Structures are given as structure tokens and as C-alpha cells.
Amino acid sequence: MRTHVPKTAMPGWIEAEGLPAGVRGGMATRRFPGVSEGRWGPANFGEHSGDDPEAVACNRACLIEALSLPSDPLWLRQVHGVGVWVEGESIIGNATERIADASVVRASRAPAVILSADCLPILLASESGGEIAAIHAGWRGLAAGVIENTLSVMHTDPRKIVAWMGPAIGQAAFEVGPEVRAAMLINDPHADRAFQRGDGDRLYADIYQLARNRLELAGCKVGGAHFCTVTSQAMHSYRRDGAVSGRMATLIWRV
């Protein structure tokens, strides 16, 4: 498993490979150009991490400028749930405050974006490029169906959707209890192959495999990186740094 960030044209940016023509996406890591200092620096995009709010606002502005984004990203108030915010509609979740863990965009060029610091970021795009989505998938959201909820409100047949999985916690660092395995098995009979035995009743979960199972079952074409946010100092990691951890931004937009 790779634990480093590859060199790209822009420091701290991991480009999402395999997206359709006319669609761009990727992750802005801790090393992206920004103004945060200390444990958050140089780039932290999370507002509730203990960082200076003015620094976070500046980092978000830098993101827009550095990537030449067509508009402000559609920031969500994430709650580790299954809510999906759909641009221009109120379907699943709170549309007014954007309280959700996924967003779908089809009517504009606004970037869909999620924040993460170990949880799995997933980007979706229709093969035509006319519909895009971003998903924040922790184990609770995966088990409860955040992927399925997102696909259910998209107008595109899942068999014509491309998925990209961004950097998340690696299996060797993701120690969990038996309740996580039990929750995953409820709606995924193949989830067992994503767990390795640890000491006692402890297990090590492969969040990439757990998400891949569900995406492929739906018919999506799946790709993406296999990093470990915990072991890479270029990444923010809640499990490694605790409540003071910053947040990375993973976004997708139509160019």
C-alpha cells in the first residue's frame, strides 16, 4: 500500500484519474498552498478543527484561486450520516443548511466538495459528464447506505457512473471492534473479506474494499488511490492527531 503523495503539477494536490472528459477532481491535502500554522499547516479546510477561522477562510479562497474553480465549492455540514444534498432540490437531508454527507450537482458548474481526515472521500461522475457527486464515507455512513442513497438520487444509471476513491485510512491502521464488521455485514454479504483478524476480538478494516463492494454491486466503474492518511504526514488524520486534526478537501467539478 502506498503511503506517500505522488508528485503532481501543484504541491499537495492529488488528481483524480479516470474521470470523464470535461470533469476534473481530486484532493487538496495538508501540503496544498495555504496559510494555516503549526499542526494545521499549511492547508486546513475544516472550520471546526481549532484552527484560526480566518486562516481556514483564506485556505478555502486559495483553493478556488489555485484550481481556477468556476465558482465557490458547495461546502457541506457533515454529520457522519447518509444525507444527500442535491443542487436545486430537497430530497434527502437538510437542503437549507446543506446538512449532509454527500452532494449531487447536475445543473451548474459548482464544485461538489467534502472534507475528510481518515474517512473515505468518493467522487462520482456520469460518463457523459453531465452529473457529478461527492461522498464523505466513514464506516458508519458506509454501513447505513450513504453510497446507495447518493446513487438513488442521481439521474444516471449506476452502470454509467465512474467512481474515484481518494486517500483514506489504510487497513493496517484501521483497528475496529466486532460491531463494525457486524454493521457492514447487514447489507453487504461480501464485507467479511475486508477484515483481518487482530488481537482478541479486534479487527483491521479495509475501508477501500468495503466501499468498492457497494459501488461495484451497484454497477459503477471504480478506481482510485490506496494511500494511508494515518501514516503520511502529508495528510491530515483524526486517528493520529485527535481533535486537533485538520481536514482535507476532495472536490469534483465540470470544466
Summary of predicted features, one role per range:
Residues 1-255:
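Active-site microenvironment for binding and transforming phosphate-containing groups
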